[in-house]
Curated annotation (Swiss-Prot):
PROSITE patterns linked: ISOCITRATE_LYASE
Protein name, as recorded: Isocitrate lyase
Phylogenetic lineage: Eukaryota, Fungi, Dikarya, Ascomycota, Pezizomycotina
Pathway given in the UniProt record: Carbohydrate metabolism; glyoxylate cycle; (S)-malate from isocitrate: step 1/2
Keywords, sorted A to Z: Glyoxylate bypass, Glyoxysome, Lyase, Magnesium, Metal-binding, Peroxisome, Tricarboxylic acid cycle
UniProt-annotated location(s): Glyoxysome
GO BP of this protein: glyoxylate cycle; tricarboxylic acid cycle
Length: 546
């Protein structure tokens, strides 16, 4: 008979219920911590525990998540920032650890350099969904290894000498790109599970539609309704709770530059949906279907669409109401606009139409179906206001919020921060210091130097250059390959080895950096202290660098 224990419990329902209630109380105690003071969970501790198995597993992700939260709490409270960049591989993560307190793993970089299918491509999230978790695991295993290696090295030195040795924190928390979640809610949960198992401290997820996902700095972005993205955030938190992890969830919105919306089902989106205000036009898709039936294609179809859009006078309903008031003979136009705005704010389009009808005495023509795309998407009035509207809705379900933007626009970043903090004053913000921006034309160098600090004062406590790993690798690779092709080994000496030695970069002794000494010590431990095949024994060429 199997033993009666936690991993193979008694079939006695009383014992089963007792174990269940103890675990439920433990979860409730966990959730009462100040860490969760801003977090809304639309599920119960009982529901979470009932989804767990009997074998408790302590994930390293939880330790790293607690560490990340502590970093961001401190930075936010002091209006400071943790800033980092996208890491490509283990060499890079060990060098970043010396100077930066977090690490970023980019979906864009993974798509181009580390797809699980080995097929590179642009940032469309069309790679296997194991891709970014695998890169997290790759880097986290390297972090663990170099942490072990350093500890062994330090403990091999007399105590009185250790104070002069570097003691690098290699275990910098990793934040990774979850794209749109790669599918429905169960896909989001499985992806979250993978990230936790691989060692991620936090993940971010964006409010684009999965089938049309684009890099944040590409055109053609389609947003999902607000509630659909909230459901994704809830799915992340639920999966992390099931696994007992404090994993941070960062909500990204692409609303600033998005032009399309998958559906108008959520009334919180209604104020930003564009409609035709020209009652004489047929619906756009009817025209496009008729044109295709006559053999038109390509540029001809684009011309038909462009001409229709020019005539449609696309507008949000609120702007259409304002235009109708301006065109009318009302004595107090400003007062009517103000009353409409105060009464219609946050209302559905149906309710806003009723307010407008009451104030203007008539219905306003506004058709948001007429301009829909051939895929069925609604036209959207994106921008900072749209992003703030979404961020406020996401705030109770995430740990930080990021608005993707077209430019490094400080005034816009300030507007977004003020909009969010007017409702959620403690909400942490994240910012993409993107290499897609032309920093030279965006601002002078002295402003570039202070940009991170200025953003931090607004509450952007975590900032990152998504693709700096890619670009720095490309730059040195181009420089070295070009020089090597003309001056041979002089290029390696001048561009690589001598600067490594001058700047005391540990990788100059690449055998030691790779852990050869550590592995020798493992081997000696097993063989009683003697090994004739030690990698770092007499004859190792690295002695030239003493």
């Amino acid at each position: 008979m199997a033993s009666q224990n936690m991993t193979n419990p008694s079939i006695n329902p009383d014992i089963e219920d007792e174990l269940f209630q103890k675990e439920v109380e433990a979860v409730k105690t966990w959730w009462s911590d100040s860490r969760w003071r801003q977090t809304k969970r639309p599920f119960t501790a009982e529901q979470i525990v009932s989804k767990r198995g009997y074998l408790p597993i302590d994930y390293a992700s939880n330790t790293q998540a607690k560490k990340l939260w502590k970093i961001l709490e401190h930075r936010f409270e002091n209006r400071d920032a943790s800033y980092t960049y996208g890491c490509l591989e283990p060499t890079m993560v060990t060098q970043m650890a010396k100077y930066l307190d977090t690490v970023y793993v980019s979906g864009w970089q993974s798509s181009s350099t580390a797809s699980a299918s080995d097929e590179p491509g642009p940032d469309l999230a069309d790679y296997p969904y194991t891709t970014v978790p695998n890169k997290v695991g790759h880097l986290f295993m390297a972090q663990l290894f170099h942490d072990r290696k350093q500890r062994q090295e330090r403990l091999s030195v007399p105590k009185e000498q250790r104070a002069n040795l570097l003691n690098i924190d290699y275990l910098r928390p990793i934040v990774a790109d979850a794209d749109t979640g790669h599918g429905g809610l169960t896909a989001v949960m499985k992806l979250t599970k993978l990230f936790i198992e691989k060692g991620a401290a936090g993940i971010h997820i964006e409010d684009q539609a999965p089938g049309t996902k684009k890099c944040g700095h590409m055109a053609g972005k389609v947003l999902v309704p607000i509630q659909e993205h909230i459901n994704r955030l809830v799915a992340i938190r639920a999966q992390a709770d099931i696994m007992g992890s404090d994993l941070l969830a960062i909500a990204r919105t692409d609303a600033e530059a998005a032009t399309l919306l998958s559906t108008n089902i959520d009334p919180r989106d209604h104020a930003f949906i564009l409609g035709s205000t020209n009652s004489t036009l047929k619906p756009l898709n009817d025209l496009m279907i008729a044109a295709e039936a006559t053999g038109k294609s390509g540029a001809e179809l684009q011309r038909i669409e462009d001409e229709w859009l020019a005539k449609a006078n696309l507008s949000s309903f609120d702007d259409a109401v304002a235009a109708a008031i301006d065109a009318g003979s009302f004595s107090d136009k400003a007062g009517i606009k103000q009353e409409y705005t105060s009464r219609a704010k946050g209302k559905s389009n149906f309710e806003a139409r009723a307010v407008a009808r009451q104030l203007l005495g008539r219905d306003i023509f506004f058709d948001w179906d007429a301009p829909r795309t051939r895929e069925g998407y609604f036209r959207l009035k994106g921008g900072c206001d749209c992003a703030v509207n979404r961020a406020i809705a996401y705030a109770p379900y995430c740990d930080a919020i990021w608005m993707e933007s077209k430019l490094p626009d400080f005034a816009q970043a300030e507007q977004f921060a003020q909009g969010v903090h007017a409702v959620w004053p403690e909400k942490k913000l994240a910012y993409n210091l993107s290499p897609s921006f032309n920093w030279k034309t965006a601002m002078p160098r002295d402003e570039q130097e202070t940009y991170i600090r200025r953003l931090a004062k607004l509450g952007y406590c975590w900032q990152f250059i998504t693709l700096a790993g890619l670009h720095t690798t490309a730059l040195i690779s181009d420089q070295f390959a070009k020089a090597y092709s003309t001056v041979g080994m002089r290029a390696y000496g001048e561009l690589v080895q001598e600067p490594e030695m001058d700047q005391k970069v540990d990788v100059v002794k690449h055998q030691k950096w790779s852990g050869a000494t550590y592995v020798d010590e493992l081997q000696k431990m097993v063989t009683g202290g003697i090994s004739s095949t030690a990698a770092m024994g007499a004859g190792v060429t690295e002695d030239q660098f003493k």
